[in-house]
Curated annotation (Swiss-Prot):
Protein name: Ribosomal RNA small subunit methyltransferase H
Binding residues for S-adenosyl-L-methionine: G37, G38, H39, D57, F85, D101, H108
GO biological process, one term: rRNA base methylation
Source lineage: Bacteria, Pseudomonadati, Bacteroidota, Bacteroidia, Bacteroidales
Coiled coil segments of this chain: none
Pfam families attached to this UniProt entry: Methyltransf_5
Enzyme class, spelled out: transferase
UniProt keyword annotation of Hydrolase present: no
Organism: Parabacteroides distasonis (strain ATCC 8503 / DSM 20701 / CIP 104284 / JCM 5825 / NCTC 11152)
Documented EC number(s): 2.1.1.199
Length: 305
């Protein structure tokens, strides 16, 4: 099981995450990004017989990694429904700590049939939940030029978003874009030799975020933590790109996504959280060397007041 999980996804900043949760043996914890179960298994090692852990994941593949442990409950769902499920289990307002590792797992990147990586040819899919929702191919073939440009600009931060969208719309008039190979062939003129990987990463990130409605889902999950965590409960979040990190940073600091500071009568900043680490935590050089995919990770820890 351990070997299989290490292939599925290597837990990023594992030690720092566990320290951030400040685990109590009899506590109630939630891993909203279960994936390969690496973080969850380490949390279980630190829980006593009365402790409880809930793991969320919308991907059916993650169920193969569920530990046979009576203290663990697997929730096959998008983490945007965190509050609904924790209320169902009678744990709303009782949770001692919540972990969210927002990165795409190695399992997804390395499975050519899932369509997350430009390294392989395969179906242009990118759905985390393969049973529902539109695929990346659906978006590329059906969105208007304006809608496509918005996706590439807002989620990929691409300056050539309008030109890129226009080329895609024109290309699909001749032939439907169904595979990663089809897609790469169309956008080839935009990929400069020096920054090809960076450009493609931005394009694929934009499509993935749109396919899975990631930014809205993240906002809903973060709002839910206000009702799920008990006072003193810890929120530990690992981000991988500037869009999600900005949301998390603002939310933990101010309680909203715009970063607007609200003050009380005495001029003190009002926030539902107290920052545990004022400075963002990043992987050590040793971890990055061991796991290059951790390079862009940022860890933030806060405590509900």
């Amino acid at each position: 099981m351990e070997e299989k999980d290490s292939c599925y996804h290597v837990p990023v900043m594992l030690r720092e995450s566990l320290e951030g949760l400040d685990i109590r043996p009899d506590g109630i914890y939630v891993d909203v990004t279960f994936g390969g179960g690496g973080h969850s298994r380490e949390i279980l090692k630190r829980l006593g017989s009365e402790g409880e852990l809930y793991g969320f994941d919308q991907d059916a593949d993650a169920e193969h990694n569920v530990p046979a442990d009576p203290r663990f409950t697997f929730v096959r769902s998008n983490f945007r429904y965190l509050y609904n499920f924790m209320r169902y289990y009678g744990e709303s307002g009782e949770v001692d700590g919540l972990l969210a590792d927002l990165g795409v797992s190695s399992h997804h990147f390395d499975d050519k049939d899932r369509g997350f990586s430009f390294r392989f040819d395969g179906t242009l899919d990118m759905r985390m939940n393969t049973r529902a929702g539109q695929t990346a191919a659906d978006i590329v073939n059906n969105y208007t030029a304006e809608a496509l440009a918005d996706v590439f600009y807002l989620y990929g931060e691409l300056k050539v978003s309008r030109k890129l969208a226009s080329v895609l719309v024109k290309a699909r008039e001749t032939k439907k874009i169904e595979t990663i190979g089809d897609f790469l062939e169309v956008i080839k003129p935009f990929t400069g030799k020096d920054k090809e990987k960076k450009f493609l990463a931005q394009v694929f990130q934009a499509l993935r975020i749109e396919v899975n409605d990631e930014m809205r889902a993240l906002k809903e999950m973060l709002r839910s933590t206000l009702r799920v965590l008990r006072p003193g409960g810890r929120l530990v979040v690992i981000t991988y790109h500037s869009l999600e990190d900005r949301l998390v940073k603002n939310f933990l600091k101010t309680g909203n996504f715009e970063g607007k500071c609200e003050q009380d009568f005495f001029g003190n900043v009002r926030s539902p959280f107290r920052l545990v680490n004022n400075k963002v935590i990043v992987p050590t050089d040793e971890e990055v060397e061991r796991n290059p995919r951790s390079r862009s990770a940022k860890l933030r820890i806060a405590e509900k007041v």
